[in-house]
């Protein structure tokens, strides 16, 4: 990379763009803003299926554990705030690591259209819908299952995503 200071992570391993770094965040804002504008996109999905904790801890000295996380999260929220400022009315879908980032500050800015990666279990979907509906009037789930019970368990949610592989010739389209 041209800017190794922008990245968190050990050499030779996976990296994480450090949104706590002002220049890295400015680059990402400009890049995503350009894509949104040029392509006429009005719904932004942030899918973030990594656990950032080890990246953050690895960047901190023993006596400063948590400082990189603090700066990163502050920068992450500033990133979204700037996208929303540049694109008023744009929806952000927070599909983040199985719903691990459904915190108050995130939910002030975004909606969880896919609240969790745990979508294969009907009872699990029912429990998620029941528990989350007390706090969030609008959230989503999906399923990749085809049974009637599975489908109805997922469809009780305000926003439903069908997670089927439409290339699969064995899908029963009459049933769907």
Listing of model-derived features with the role each one plays in the protein:
Residues 1-11, 59, 63, 106-116:
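Aromatic- and acidic-residue-enriched segments that line the glycan-binding/catalytic groove
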Residues 1, 45-47, 93-95:
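A cross-family glycoside hydrolase active-site/sugar-binding cleft signature
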Residues 1-38:
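Active-site-adjacent "subsite" loops/lids of carbohydrate-active enzymes
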Residues 15-19, 23, 63-74:
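Alpha-helix capping and helix-loop boundary segments enriched in small/acidic/polar residues
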Residues 3-6, 10, 48-52, 158:
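Short, small-residue-rich loop/turn micro-motifs
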Residues 27-62:
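Active-site groove signature of glycoside hydrolases
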């Amino acid at each position: 990379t041209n800017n190794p200071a922008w990245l968190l992570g050990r050499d030779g391993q996976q990296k994480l763009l450090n949104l706590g770094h002002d220049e890295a965040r400015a680059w990402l804002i400009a890049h995503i803003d350009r894509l949104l504008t040029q392509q006429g996109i009005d719904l932004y999905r942030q899918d973030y299926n990594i656990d950032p904790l080890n990246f953050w801890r690895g960047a901190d000295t023993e006596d400063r554990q948590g400082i990189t996380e603090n700066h990163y999260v502050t920068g992450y929220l500033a990133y979204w705030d700037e996208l929303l400022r540049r694109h008023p009315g744009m929806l952000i879908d927070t599909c983040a690591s199985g719903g691990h980032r459904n915190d108050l500050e995130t939910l002030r800015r975004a909606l969880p259209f896919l609240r969790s990666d745990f979508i294969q279990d009907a009872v699990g979907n029912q429990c998620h819908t029941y528990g989350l509906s007390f706090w969030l009037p609008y959230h989503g789930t999906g399923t990749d299952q085809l049974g009637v019970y599975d489908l109805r368990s997922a469809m009780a949610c305000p926003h439903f995503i069908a997670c089927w592989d439409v290339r699969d010739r064995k899908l029963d389209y009459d049933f769907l």
